[in-house]
Amino acid sequence: MRPPRCLFPAAEILLKAPPSRRCMSSAAAFQPPKIVAAIPWKGSSFFLSNRLFDRSTCLDFVVLRRANGIRSTSASASTTHDSTLSSSPTANHSTSAHKDHKIAPHRKRQAQRREKAAAEAAAAAARGEKPLPPDASSLLAAHAASQTSPLRRHLSACLSLAKPRLTMLVVLTAMATYALYPVPEMLSPSTTETPSLSPLTLLFLTIGTTFCSASANALNMLYEPSTDAKMTRTRNRPLVRNLISKRAAVLFAILSGFVGTGALYFGVNPTVSGLGFANIVIYAGMYTPLKAVTAFNTWIGAVVGGIPPLMGWAAAAGETATKDGSWRELLFASDGSSIGGWVMAGLLFAWQFPHFMALSWPIREEYKKAGLRMLAWTNPARNGRVALRYSFVFIPLCLSLCAAGVTEWSFAVTSFPINAWLIRESVRFWRYEGNKGSARGLFWASVWHLPGVMILALLHKKGMWTRVWRSVFGEDEGEWEEEELDEMMSVAVANTNSHMQNQKTVR
């Protein structure tokens, strides 16, 4: 016969809890334990009523879990065991309910999305298809397909046309080069509040570069929807799935091009606007068609990757131009101040090869099936050699940044480990011909290499920490006067030399 159900399990189980072990003498160890009467705790009435926990049953879950571990030593062990077994289903139910209650709503949604993605992948595998890659364009295209509102569907499709991740990379390279431009002494904290260039120019540079990149990417998708449909990496693009019409895509590309070049022309300078327009033309008009003609298309695409650093450099140089501010002065300055921009462009040009060679290797058969000529399948041995060759270029390029006065010489030391890492992965990629995980290793090394080099260059920018020190602690007036006199003397000597050369030319 089972005992009657306990109305207040919390109080009863707490009284049944075994006493804690204490260090005691051998004599005290043999003394019988004292029996504590089942009376309410006196001290608890100072704060709240003894029956408050029992009425609210807030501790029943915790106490019942402890009850499963209690082993009674009294004569009524069987009775306690039966009562524990009778309460265990309730405890298990409470435990599962409590766990479900503890899961945050966003965690539940993430779990549901993972289950849905796994189900879709299993269904695609059952049909003999490969699951779609979870890149930004695929996710945006899937989001656009699920929208019921035509406006939201078109906005998501247009965002997918812009290739957000690639556009973000292009914009960041332009912004980093803009920030790396050496700030002249006339923009030092002695005359301005912060040792930086115009933030408004940076804003227009960011907006213009974003729209120019979006225009080029949209035109790229417009040109090759048939080849995109043959590749797992690109078959989920909006034009392949007919999520947006070609007319709307053309309109988006044209408007983005006009907005981007216009923002660069009126907000920055005409030279940067021309570079943005050249980026669109080379990427959409040369690189995209040549992908089906020759493997040399990779070099054309690398030129496109080197243009954004030139845009950032020309944008910064236009603010300190002393002459007419033409493209010759900004890109081919007679004093050699434009060398840093070309070195940064060369760095981005060289980075394209180890990155793309590693990226194209796992999907070389898909490129071949789509009719796109890439070195990964046309000449696999040369594919590894090209990646290795251009990975060695980064060491002299980093040294050139130091020699050009863009960064301190300490940058050559701090950038060496990350350059050595890229070289090591390129050697493995060339030696194993993309096998044994070498392609994946080189890909991730290239992914982390570019932001690492950029961040190190910004940290070692020439004179940056000196200007920060002066802006915080100030500088001596005599020191500033000496620097100003030295600068005036150097300018006077340069003007005198140029005047003498002009007179010799006239004679």
Curated annotation (Swiss-Prot):
EC number from the UniProt entry: 2.5.1.141
Sequence ranges of Basic residues compositional bias: 99-111
Enzyme class: transferase
Record's keyword terms, sorted: Heme biosynthesis, Membrane, Mitochondrion, Transferase, Transit peptide, Transmembrane, Transmembrane helix
Membrane topology type: Multi-pass membrane protein
One GO CC term on file: mitochondrial membrane
InterPro entries, alphabetized: Protohaem_IX_farnesylTrfase, Protohaem_IX_farnesylTrfase_mt, UbiA_prenyltransferase, UbiA_prenylTrfase_CS, UbiA_sf
Transmembrane stretches, start-end: 166-186, 199-219, 248-268, 270-290, 298-318, 339-359, 392-412, 441-461
Swiss-Prot/TrEMBL catalytic activity: heme b + (2E,6E)-farnesyl diphosphate + H2O = Fe(II)-heme o + diphosphate
GO molecular function: protoheme IX farnesyltransferase activity
CDD domains: PT_UbiA_Cox10
Keyword Mitochondrion carried by entry: yes
Gene Ontology biological process terms in this record: heme A biosynthetic process
Tagged with keyword Magnesium: no
Localization in the cell: Mitochondrion membrane
Family the UniProt entry places it in: Belongs to the UbiA prenyltransferase family.
Function: Converts protoheme IX and farnesyl diphosphate to heme O.
The protein, known as: Protoheme IX farnesyltransferase, mitochondrial
Highest classification ranks of the organism: Eukaryota, Fungi, Dikarya, Ascomycota, Pezizomycotina
Gene (UniProt): COX10
